[in-house]
């Protein structure tokens, strides 16, 4: 449940939503995807209300293991998006090959999910989303279950993909540093005893140079300052 909230995500922007479990992060994301209808208010994409799922919007789930079909190969899992989108069969191999190259999985096209590491499985899910050529990418804690080194590698890969494809991203995370590293803006909720229902309490601009780099960006004085500011804010709310 979310209190009345107004959030605007601009075209080509990377916006992170951060907060503890139960603060409404996933509800906001699911409403943006058209998976659920808000009980009040509206969700708009451009000037049009979101009435349901759209090919222009792709959703990356946290649980990559359940998002992939174990009896389909990597290429077969990516083909799902093309089949659902009505892409002619003759055009699918080229589209699949292109996104596999984009995420660096060309050599694994005929492997099954169980033969891949967690990070590689998540890249398959991202590749499947890219295959549908979306304008908006919604991501629900996609790297939360991965080890630190894999998570940082995929963060950098995601930033490269977003920049090269001109995607708009709404990214949910509970990791404060991940939000600051990836985002152009960070949305923080108001929770705690003074909030009957979670609501958006702060939207923080992340004024850090791009391209970003794991060590340099995290040691940047602005990053350190924003981390302290956001940590103190979340601690109070």
What are these regions (language model features)?
Residues 72-83:
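Q-loop/switch helix immediately C-terminal to the Walker
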Residues 83, 90-108, 160:
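Conserved ABC ATPase "signature" region
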Residues 131-135:
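A short, proline-enriched helix->beta-strand linker immediately N-terminal to the Walker B motif
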Residues 112-116, 120:
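Conserved ABC ATPase signature
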Residues 18-20:
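The feature captures the beta-strand-to-loop junction immediately N-terminal to the Walker
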Residues 137-140:
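Catalytic Walker B motif of ABC-type/P-loop ATPase nucleotide-binding domains
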Residues 41-53:
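Conserved ABC transporter NBD signature motif
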Residues 33:
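Helix-to-loop junction immediately C-terminal to a conserved catalytic motif
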């Amino acid at each position: 449940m979310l209190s009345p909230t107004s959030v605007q995500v601009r075209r080509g922007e990377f916006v992170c939503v951060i907060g503890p479990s139960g603060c409404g992060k996933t509800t906001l994301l699911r409403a943006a995807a058209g998976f659920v209808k808000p009980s009040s208010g509206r969700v708009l994409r451009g000037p049009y209300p979101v009435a349901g799922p759209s090919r222009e919007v792709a959703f990356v789930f946290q649980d990559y293991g359940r998002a992939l079909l174990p009896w389909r190969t990597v290429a077969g899992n990516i083909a799902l998006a093309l089949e659902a989108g009505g892409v002619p069969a003759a055009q699918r191999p080229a589209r699949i090959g292109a996104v596999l190259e984009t995420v660096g999985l060309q050599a694994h096209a005929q492997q099954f999910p169980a033969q891949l590491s967690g990070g590689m499985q998540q890249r398959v899910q991202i590749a499947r989303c890219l295959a549908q050529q979306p304008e908006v990418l919604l991501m629900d804690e996609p790297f939360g279950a991965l080890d630190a080194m894999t998570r940082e590698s995929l963060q950098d890969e995601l930033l490269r993909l977003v920049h090269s494809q001109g995607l708009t991203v709404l990214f949910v995370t509970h990791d404060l540093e991940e939000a600051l590293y990836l985002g152009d803006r960070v949305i923080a909720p108001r929770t705690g005893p003074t909030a009957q229902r979670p609501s958006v309490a702060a939207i923080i601009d992340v004024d850090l140079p791009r391209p970003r780099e794991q060590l340099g960006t995290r040691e940047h004085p602005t990053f350190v300052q924003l981390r302290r500011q956001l940590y103190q804010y979340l601690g109070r709310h």
